[in-house]
Design a protein with these regions (language model features):
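Domain-level signature for soluble enzymes in the chorismate/prephenate branch of the shikimate pathway
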Residues: 1-359
């Protein structure tokens, strides 16, 4: 390519950059007006259902060469910046900084939100319930290790609801304050992360003691003070805490993802591509669970997941968590819930919300 041709292309790119900048500021002015209207009508600045529709329309109209994920990433920050012009969004998450929950929160809300790490799951729910932070992000299940019981326990009692879901691909690294693997005697991490790379650790560090922590980011912080320790955490945690990456991609299965929930007050509106999560209990008699679930089959509503959870106050009795396709405000779904209620001793709608994008 000739130099003058490259110069011409760069000039055209520069002109497009200026036009994009003009349009972004024009969009910002419109966003401020939208914020004023929302304020007068008492509506939320962050509307998960509306944003899900925006992303679906953008990716549906995308003709390339930008891949859909790139389009989502770009517009995530545009929307995050527009929200910040209206009212700053504050989000509580299971910390510390650089945990996978922090990464999920950033991926969902964008960089212009304000993020507050919490050391315990209960504090996140308490913040949301008391409007200290109106939004929270919590892990609910991993594709390899299953459900996060702490989150399930909080969902039983909370007045907050599920407003959205986030899927995050998990890539695990072995981090240390040095590059000498032979010096490692202890491995720190969250129990789910340790489970996700169980075989790799057994083959490569069989004699190391494994120490459980509250999060992968906490493990990275512990390693700063332990020269004989290593952490199973993310590359972002290595950057945040100034650690070396000794090995990357140590998870036993590459298709490793964690699902997170966005919790908040109120309810998300239908988008046409939604999920609903419920919690229920049945009488302790033969066939009770079958009867409770029969309405799903009759209405041809797809049950995505069901799992039992022990009742703390009643030994050997269980609650059931279930996810299914559809929104509670839709006629067919509402009928299923009404019929199901006849066969349960307890039924709680945890929330209907837009289906998350699986990366």
């Amino acid at each position: 390519m000739k130099d003058d041709s490259l110069k011409s292309l760069r000039e055209n790119l520069g002109k497009q950059d200026q036009e994009i900048l003009r349009l972004l500021n024009e969009r910002g002015r419109l966003a401020i007006e939208v914020g004023r209207v929302k304020s007068r009508k008492g509506r939320e600045v962050y509307d998960p259902s509306q944003e899900a529709k925006v992303f679906a329309k953008l990716t549906g109209n995308n003709t390339g060469p930008l891949p859909d994920q790139a389009v989502r990433n770009i517009f995530r920050e545009i929307i995050s910046s527009s929200r910040a012009l209206q009212t700053p969004i504050s989000v509580a998450y299971l910390g510390p900084e650089a945990s996978f929950t922090h990464q999920a929160a950033l991926a969902h809300f964008g960089l212009e939100a304000s993020f507050y790490p919490k050391p315990a799951m209960a504090e996140i729910f308490r913040d949301v319930e008391r409007d200290i932070n109106p939004w929270g992000v919590v892990p609910i299940e991993n594709s390899l290790e299953g459900s996060v019981r702490q989150t399930q326990s909080q969902l039983i009692a909370t007045s907050a609801g599920i407003r959205a879901e986030i899927f995050l691909r998990i890539t695990l690294c072995l981090l240390a304050s040095h590059r000498r693997a032979e010096k490692i005697r202890r491995i720190y991490s969250h129990p789910h992360a340790l489970g996700q790379c169980r075989d790799w650790l057994r083959k490569n560090l069989p004699d190391c003691r494994q120490i459980e922590t509250g999060s992968t980011a906490e493990a990275a912080r512990r390693v700063l003070e332990d020269r004989g320790g290593a952490a199973v955490a993310s590359r972002i945690a290595a950057t945040t805490y100034g650690l070396s990456v000794l090995n990357e991609g140590i998870e036993d299965y590459p298709e490793n993802a964690t699902r997170f929930l966005v919790i908040g007050k109120g309810a998300s509106k239908p988008t046409g591509d939604d999920k609903t999560s419920i919690l229920f209990a049945t009488p302790h008699v033969p066939g009770a669970l079958h009867q409770a679930l029969t309405p799903f089959s009759k209405a041809k509503v797809n049950l995505l997941r069901i799992e039992s959870h022990p009742m703390r106050e009643r030994i050997w009795e269980y609650l059931f968590f279930a996810d299914f396709e559809g929104h509670a405000e839709e006629k067919k779904t509402a009928k299923v819930l009404r019929e199901m209620n006849s066969w349960t001793t307890f039924l709680k709608n945890l929330g209907s919300y837009p289906r998350g994008e699986q990366s």
